[in-house]
């Protein structure tokens, strides 16, 4: 599984040739890429409708958008997507050679439009190369994109226990989401091997010293390694 961070919360994930673009927003200082530089993904996954998560979604309308039904409905009727997969909390869908499970995120959601529009709830995703199961002993690899969220008990009780991700991209910039301390606790609860900070140093309120996360994880009850990626850097999971 190839994980490429394009800054903020934008990730490109390749699972055995099936490709995903999560929360496309290339107007951030970490990336040198433009959305038009990105090869068409098979799927665009959207966690919620804030502008710093869907800002460049309109560039990828010739692919399949995935999200809560309210989100995918909006993307079809107002943005121009013609193919969509509407799913909801707890659901798993097969996408090419991968499986995508949706989980909730503890955040707000909304759109600035000329009229009221229900856009659904914020979410996160677990992408795996095998279907989640409790009965089969599968050698799976999985990646958790937490979306915008605060610390949630479900990270320990559901995601960590049942879905068992190997790696997690966690918002770390504080103010609007978790900060370094909560993100480090999340890493413990998730029991992941790899932690990737995201949603930090994009604009003033979320500028932090990212070394705080490294120190917090290092002093906690976890063997996870923090990987502070450069913009557009790829990690092989």
Curated annotation (Swiss-Prot):
Keywords: Hydrolase. Pfam families: Lactamase_B_2. The keyword Hydrolase applies. It comes from the Archaea. The keyword Hydrolase applies. NCBIfam families: PRK00685.1. This is UPF0173 metal-dependent hydrolase HQ_3368A. It comes from Haloquadratum walsbyi (strain DSM 16790 / HBSQ001).
